[in-house]
């Protein structure tokens, strides 16, 4: 058969049509009632070379990001010629609920919340289950069913086009449904009707009056309203098909492909099959309630194979897998290259000699970096010492905290080195709204890495490394969608505990082999205030330690002004006597922190507790009040990042010190490249904090950009007299 890249448009749901000369039919209906269309061989350009994503956040233009429909993610490059040598049949639509239930009768049968219709696309299906469905259907019919390769998917989506979408360089009116996340909608779009490509109800002029950018218009959808208006429906084939008769290639649900995710390579390829191995499987097409930039024909995404994210679906291909070539695994990033496996002999520094160093720049990212690490926002740090003496830090790197163009980056401060290495990619699923990663060393041979994602954006995974982070185990399912995890704690009796924001605590009593949920998520009607109790930690972004009497204590951040008033504008503290199942709420002596700030709480090896936080909320920085600190000539008021030490299990905190190198007033940079002044009385005013104590006795504290190292003796010592 002659190779070509274009065929005449067909009606997607047309009855069986036989070709002249006894050729295979263009459309078939299988035993499930599934319509499939024949895709002919051909050659096309896969990927997109530009234009690159701009630094909208750094340029103070974030509210314009939704207009960037043509800007690419780094993993779409280089664009390259691909030849598909064999025809295949592809599902005209995503697999529907009715079709999937012939494989699994129980699929969402008891899901009272979504109540999917039979012609809705089957959502929340893992890659593993999609493959299992294909194997079942293959056995049932005696024909090969499978997921499309990534190249087959993009080839079929484009249907001969070279534009951003198969409909041109934009989508038709109301093509992209939006009913999934009001918080993200108001983060991206100004008040009022959404752009014409989006399908969302319009607000009247009265509803829009007085609203500012980022404020909610019209309230949240209820499920009943959404289905009544068809805006919340996942019904297939409601939009015009592409030129080859395929529906919903842009939006509705994202669709699994067979490939392992990995970077593209340049040069022409024939029947590519992706990488030989990886951590993530590719998905394509984008999903509802996201910016249309993520629906482009070239856009790529990836997830762990066991992720049952509710915006994932799939469509099938009938035909043998192409006899293409698998690419080798991608080379390791800088943070995993040439990692020493020598365990050094580390002698602790004299405990009575004060030591301080910093701030040292941790986040080395080029000013114009737009992938795989980003210049705009580097946030939510985690740090651990490795057995070989290296410090390993990881964090979220993104153009904006709410954007799907989000990655995990990492850097090493190698043992004996003076500077952190340039940031490089860490474990990262593409087009997934990442949350704060967590790293922890068990003190022996094993590093733990807990992957975090935005609440309801997917499952969480756990990995291990026994070679100082040079390689990691395959990710294992840790828990279904939850909110952000915070720093892991190990108790005296070996219990591992991870506190979650406004959620429960995940607890392991067998060294991490199995985990149980203790407590539950906060409910909006509960009266959270000092003196009351509940099944969760008050506030969020909690930092937690075990007390000498076996209780757990957590300090948290708190944002809403009315809730802060209940705690007299002080940091909430919560206590649990039953391993996190119930909590008693109180307030500490320290000022409350809020948006863009996070505290840290550690049990030092010397025995005392260390608490690091900020004297003032970032939103109040212009009217800051500060705290009183000791100097060699008496008390003074300091502002910003501080450390405090307790010798009586958190009852009092007599030793405090502003975390600053002191000296003449000068500029430094913090979170989101925000400048601040540093001096004898001024310290870093805003950031998320995390810390670990290394074997030399030093506290390794990192902010969203910087690294400080100091010891207990330094915190206890009075600061030099501030210069006037």
Indicate residue ranges for each PLM-predicted region.
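Positively charged n-region of N-terminal signal peptides that target proteins for export
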Residues: 1-5
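Bacterial N-terminal signal peptides
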Residues: 7-15
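A short glycine-rich, aromatic-capped structural motif
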Residues: 28-110, 126-128, 251, 320
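Functional-site microenvironments in short loops/helix caps that host divalent-cation chemistry
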Residues: 45, 54, 58-72, 110, ...
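Short proline/glycine-enriched turn/loop segments at secondary-structure junctions
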Residues: 271-275, 301-308, 631-632, 679-680, ...
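Short, structured beta-strand segments at or near domain termini in extracellular proteins/domains
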Residues: 309-323
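Asp-box/BNR beta-propeller blade signature and adjacent active/binding-site loops
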Residues: 328-724
């Amino acid at each position: 058969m002659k190779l070509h890249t274009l065929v005449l448009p067909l009606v997607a749901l047309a009855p069986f049509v036989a070709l002249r000369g006894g050729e295979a039919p263009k459309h078939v209906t299988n035993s499930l009632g599934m319509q499939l269309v024949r895709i002919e061989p051909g050659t096309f350009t896969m990927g997109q070379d530009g234009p690159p994503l701009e630094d909208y956040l750094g340029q103070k233009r974030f509210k314009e990001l939704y207009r960037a429909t043509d800007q690419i993610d780094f993993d779409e490059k280089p664009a390259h010629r691909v030849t598909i040598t064999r025809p295949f049949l592809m599902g005209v639509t995503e697999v529907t609920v009715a079709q999937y239930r012939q494989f699994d009768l129980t699929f969402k049968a008891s899901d009272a919340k979504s109540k999917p219709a039979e012609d809705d696309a089957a959502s929340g299906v893992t890659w593993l289950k999609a493959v299992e469905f294909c194997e079942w259907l293959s056995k049932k019919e005696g024909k090969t069913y499978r997921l499309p390769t990534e190249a087959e998917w993009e080839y079929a989506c484009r249907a001969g086009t070279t534009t951003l979408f198969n409909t041109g360089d934009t989508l038709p009116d109301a093509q992209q449904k939006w009913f999934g996340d009001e918080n993200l909608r108001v983060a991206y779009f100004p008040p009022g009707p959404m752009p014409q490509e989006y399908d969302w109800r319009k607000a009247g002029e009265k509803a829009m009056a007085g609203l500012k950018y980022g404020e909610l218009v019209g309230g949240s959808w209820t499920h009943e309203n959404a289905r009544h208006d068809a805006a919340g429906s996942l019904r297939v084939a409601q939009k015009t098909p592409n030129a080859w008769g395929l529906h919903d290639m842009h939006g509705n649900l994202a669709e699994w492909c067979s490939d392992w995710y990995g970077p593209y390579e340049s040069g022409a390829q024939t029947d590519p099959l992706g990488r030989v191995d990886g951590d993530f499987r590719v998905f394509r097409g984008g999903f509802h309630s996201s910016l249309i930039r993520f629906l482009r024909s070239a856009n790529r995404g990836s997830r762990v194979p066991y992720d049952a994210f509710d915006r994932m679906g799939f469509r099938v291909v009938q035909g043998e897998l192409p006899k293409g070539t698998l690419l080798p695994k991608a080379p390791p990033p800088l943070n995993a290259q040439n990692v020493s496996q020598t365990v050094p002999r580390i002698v602790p520094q004299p405990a009575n000699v004060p030591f301080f160093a910093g701030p040292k720049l941790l986040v080395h990212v080029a000013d114009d970096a737009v992938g795989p690490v980003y210049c705009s926002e580097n946030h939510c740090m985690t740090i651990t010492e490795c057995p070989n003496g290296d410090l390993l830090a990881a964090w979220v790197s993104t153009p904006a905290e709410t954007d799907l163009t989000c990655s995990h980056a990492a850097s090493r401060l190698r043992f004996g080195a003076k500077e952190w290495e340039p940031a490089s990619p860490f474990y990262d699923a593409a087009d997934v709204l990442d949350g704060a990663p967590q790293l922890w060393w068990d003190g022996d041979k094993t590093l733990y890495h807990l992957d975090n994602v935005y609440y309801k954006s997917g499952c969480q995974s756990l990995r291990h490394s026994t070679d100082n982070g040079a390689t990691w185990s395959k990710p294992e399912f840790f828990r279904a969608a939850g909110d952000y995890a915070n720093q892991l704690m190990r108790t005296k009796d070996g219990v591992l505990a991870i506190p979650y924001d406004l959620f429960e605590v995940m607890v392991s009593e067998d060294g991490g082999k199995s985990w149980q949920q203790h407590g539950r998520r906060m409910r909006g009607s509960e009266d959270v205030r000092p003196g009351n109790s509940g099944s969760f930690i008050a506030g969020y972004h909690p930092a937690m330690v075990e007390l000498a009497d076996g209780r757990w204590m957590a300090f948290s951040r708190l944002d809403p002004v009315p809730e802060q008033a209940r705690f007299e504008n002080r940091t909430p503290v919560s206590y649990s006597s039953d391993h996190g199942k119930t909590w008693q709420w109180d307030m500490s002596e320290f000022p409350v922190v809020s948006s863009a700030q996070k505290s840290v709480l550690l049990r030092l090896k010397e025995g005392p507790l260390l608490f690091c936080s900020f004297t003032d909320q970032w939103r109040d920085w212009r009217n800051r009040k500060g705290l009183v600190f000791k100097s060699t000539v008496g008390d003074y008021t300091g502002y910003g990042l501080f450390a405090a030490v307790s010798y009586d299990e958190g009852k009092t905190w007599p030793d405090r010190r502003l975390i600053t190198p002191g000296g003449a007033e000068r500029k430094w940079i913090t979170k989101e490249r925000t400048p601040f002044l540093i001096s004898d009385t001024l310290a870093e005013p805003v950031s998320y904090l995390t810390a670990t104590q290394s074997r030399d006795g030093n506290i390794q504290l990192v902010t969203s950009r910087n690294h400080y190292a100091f010891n207990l003796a330094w915190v206890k010592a009075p600061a030099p007299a501030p210069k006037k």
